[in-house]
């Protein structure tokens, strides 16, 4: 397949991705083992965040990391692609964190998502969906900012293909980059949501109330 050799010529990236997958799998197993069936929410959160991080590494690796590392291009274009990808991802994560923090800062949401059951505080999985719904109702500035991030990342990558004398074999990587960049941003944001909702918040509630926060079925 045209361009498939570019995926195979750089074994270091595959080794890094495989190493991350192995490390996150070990981390997930350790979290489940440490929980020992008690259903502690923050340990479930650790496992979920590790899974999101592993998927993000694979998606980002298959998309823009392979593109900027394997395709021969001028150093200025390579630097521009890296800068846009890294800056855009960080901006996306910061924006997501602000949206989620705004929802978690509402006492009515905390009271609804985390129910005091006497000896423990119970959290329902439906709260994640409620959080996503509420956090997605962000202001127009945040929506425009996230839209510009996605547009800028794809525009720079496509502009490099137009202006730089890239080989035709790079088109497969270009296609995968354009296709998977939104997915990488989604999983980066999902990891941020998991950290704030399923790790930071339950740990804070456990310190305040002196009770474990557990995960329950809907």
Please state what every model-predicted region is:
Residues 1, 44-52, 123-155:
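Loop-to-transmembrane boundary segments
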Residues 156-167:
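Transmembrane alpha-helical segments of integral membrane proteins
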Residues 1-85, 169-180:
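N-terminal first transmembrane alpha-helix
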Residues 79-96, 151-156, 173-195:
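Alpha-helical membrane-embedded segments
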């Amino acid at each position: 397949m045209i361009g498939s050799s570019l995926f195979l010529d750089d074994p270091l990236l595959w080794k890094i991705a495989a190493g991350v997958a192995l490390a996150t799998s070990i981390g997930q197993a350790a979290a489940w083992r440490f929980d020992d069936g008690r259903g502690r929410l923050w340990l479930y959160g650790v496992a979920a965040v590790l899974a999101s991080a592993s998927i993000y590494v694979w998606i980002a690796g298959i998309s823009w990391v392979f593109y900027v590392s394997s395709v021969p291009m001028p150093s200025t274009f390579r630097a521009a692609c890296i800068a846009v990808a890294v800056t855009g991802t960080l901006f996306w994560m910061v924006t997501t964190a602000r949206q989620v923090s705004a929802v978690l800062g509402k006492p009515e949401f905390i009271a609804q998502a985390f129910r005091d059951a006497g000896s423990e505080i119970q959290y329902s999985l439906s709260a994640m969906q409620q959080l996503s719904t509420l956090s997605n109702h962000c202001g127009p500035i945040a929506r425009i900012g996230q839209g510009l991030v996605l547009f800028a990342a794809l525009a720079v990558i496509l502009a490099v293909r137009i202006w730089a004398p890239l080989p035709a074999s790079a088109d497969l990587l270009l296609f995968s980059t354009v296709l998977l960049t939104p997915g990488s941003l989604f999983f980066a944001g999902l990891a941020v949501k998991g950290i704030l909702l399923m790790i930071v918040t339950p740990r804070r509630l456990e310190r305040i109330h002196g009770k474990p926060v557990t995960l329950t079925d809907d």
